């Protein structure tokens, strides 16, 4: 059987890892073993946090809507319930943006709901 030296393949594999970890500090970007571990950890963290971001943003939207609704004298629960009963199709992201940027429009929505 012929001998295979793997020079190019191994170099290419290491180069890919080092490009992934190029901005990391110290040995995490210089030594292959630690760079490999940190690269895998970074990818796992980014996967986890992409899903966590969705959760966190939804919580933020609900908090903002609740604050704006309480300024208008109604709780968040009642607001969402009245939105569904009146068949107003505004999701939480849109409501939070309206509450934050255009309070007059949000007040108009509240009046429409309370009729």
Swiss-Prot record:
<dbReference type="GO" id="GO:0009507">
    <property type="term" value="C:chloroplast"/>
</dbReference>
<dbReference type="GO" id="GO:0000027">
    <property type="term" value="P:ribosomal large subunit assembly"/>
</dbReference>
<keyword id="KW-0699">rRNA-binding</keyword>
<dbReference type="GO" id="GO:1990904">
    <property type="term" value="C:ribonucleoprotein complex"/>
</dbReference>
<keyword id="KW-0150">Chloroplast</keyword>
<keyword id="KW-0934">Plastid</keyword>
<comment type="function">
    <text>Binds directly to 23S ribosomal RNA and is necessary for the in vitro assembly process of the 50S ribosomal subunit. It is not involved in the protein synthesizing functions of that subunit.</text>
</comment>
<comment type="similarity">
    <text>Belongs to the bacterial ribosomal protein bL20 family.</text>
</comment>
<dbReference type="GO" id="GO:0005840">
    <property type="term" value="C:ribosome"/>
</dbReference>
<dbReference type="Pfam" id="PF00453">
    <property type="entry name" value="Ribosomal_L20"/>
</dbReference>
<protein>
    <recommendedName>
        <fullName>Large ribosomal subunit protein bL20c</fullName>
    </recommendedName>
</protein>
<dbReference type="InterPro" id="IPR035566">
    <property type="entry name" value="Ribosomal_protein_bL20_C"/>
</dbReference>
<keyword id="KW-0694">RNA-binding</keyword>
<dbReference type="InterPro" id="IPR005813">
    <property type="entry name" value="Ribosomal_bL20"/>
</dbReference>
<keyword id="KW-0687">Ribonucleoprotein</keyword>
<dbReference type="InterPro" id="IPR049946">
    <property type="entry name" value="RIBOSOMAL_L20_CS"/>
</dbReference>
<keyword id="KW-0689">Ribosomal protein</keyword>
<dbReference type="GO" id="GO:0019843">
    <property type="term" value="F:rRNA binding"/>
</dbReference>
<dbReference type="GO" id="GO:0003735">
    <property type="term" value="F:structural constituent of ribosome"/>
</dbReference>
<dbReference type="GO" id="GO:0006412">
    <property type="term" value="P:translation"/>
</dbReference>
């Amino acid at each position: 059987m012929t001998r295979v030296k793997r020079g190019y393949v191994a170099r290419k594999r290491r180069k890919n890892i080092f490009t992934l970890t190029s901005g990391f500090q110290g040995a995490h970007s210089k030594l292959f073993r630690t760079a490999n571990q940190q690269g895998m950890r970074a990818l796992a963290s980014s996967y986890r946090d992409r899903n966590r971001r969705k959760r966190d943003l939804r919580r933020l939207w609900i908090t903002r809507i609740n604050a704006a609704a309480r300024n208008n004298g109604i709780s968040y629960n009642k607001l969402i319930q009245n939105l569904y009963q009146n068949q107003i199709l505004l999701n939480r992201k849109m409501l939070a943006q309206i509450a934050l940027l255009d309070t007059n429009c949000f007040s108009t929505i509240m009046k429409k709901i309370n009729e």
